[in-house]
Every structure is written in C-alpha cells, then in structure tokens.
C-alpha cells in the first residue's frame, strides 16, 4: 500500500530561504506530495511550491527577505508595523506573479494555518480560500506577533499561527497522512529560550481587550513564543 506523505513547513522569517532551497530541489527532482501544510513564512513559500514556480521561491525566500523596505521605518509608516508583509507580498507578485491556474490545478493539497485571536484557536484553510489578488490569507498567516498588526479576515482577527502551533504536524495527521517530512528553519539541537518579561507587557499593550491575552501569558511564561 502506498504511503501518504505530508510536507510540513514552519515559519522562520528570513530563514525560510533555506526552506525555499529544499523546495526548489523537490521541484527539480519532480518530487510531489499529496498534502502540504505551512504557517507564516512556511505558508508563503508553499504557495510557490504548489504553483510549481521555482523563480517565485527565490524571490520569496531571498529577494523579498533581503529588501531593505521589508523591515524598519518604511513599513512602520505604511503598515503600522515593523515588518511590512503587505509590501513583501506585493514585491513578490511584481517579480514573480502567482501562476494561479497551476496552483489550483495541482492535485497537491495545501493548508495555511492562522491564529484566531478571538477564540485562541489555530484554524487551517485550504488553497481555495486564497484570493490571488489580495492574498489576505497569506498576509494574516505571516502577521508576526508584536511586529505587525493583526488582520481582519472572514469576520475574525488573525495573526501568525506560530504563537500556538509552530510545527503543524497534528494537522497533517488529521488529514490522514501516514508519514511526514518536516523542513525546519532551526539549527540541530535547537532549544527555545524563555521569552523576556517585556514581551508579556507589550502583548497587553498591543492587544488590549482581547480574550487571547491570558493564552499569550501562558505561552510567554512557558518560553514557547
């Protein structure tokens, strides 16, 4: 019996360049998967993988990540956040427009993880939810904690699912995959250090009145953020 193998990509910001290199090799060798799932930058690059666009992987993982307008004062003025996810998505589209037809016709399934701030749950949406023009689904998945503003979409407030589910292997299991290939953006033997207390204070300041603040307290206290 043929095993069903899921491909899992975590976030990692600019370190997703390494993920892009692996995905390019998969494309070069015609290695396909029935199911893929990603969060944050992992979701962004999986869009390029499912659309079979080698150049888009390079643009997303290297060119966009190294663009000086992606981080700092420019996005702070334009998007009210230190990381300019809207600018990055537009930059990628200008240099390597999404081949939406190939993306949708590819039999590979793609789930993108978002953190719903209203109910403290991670929700996964298939590629059919991706608007090829706005791409709010990807932008919301890449909305980094404390660095970008949350996104309103589908009647709820969303941000980077890495707050809760850094490695979405459980979603791959739920989708019936027998085995899983995980592309990590962390070095071998990586152990996350406890987060500093200032993140707890900033979370209360940045996200006042949200039901998820208590959940964030637990996440930060456990050093999982």
Regions found by a protein language model. Give the residues of each.
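Patatin-like phospholipase
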Residues: 1-39, 47-225
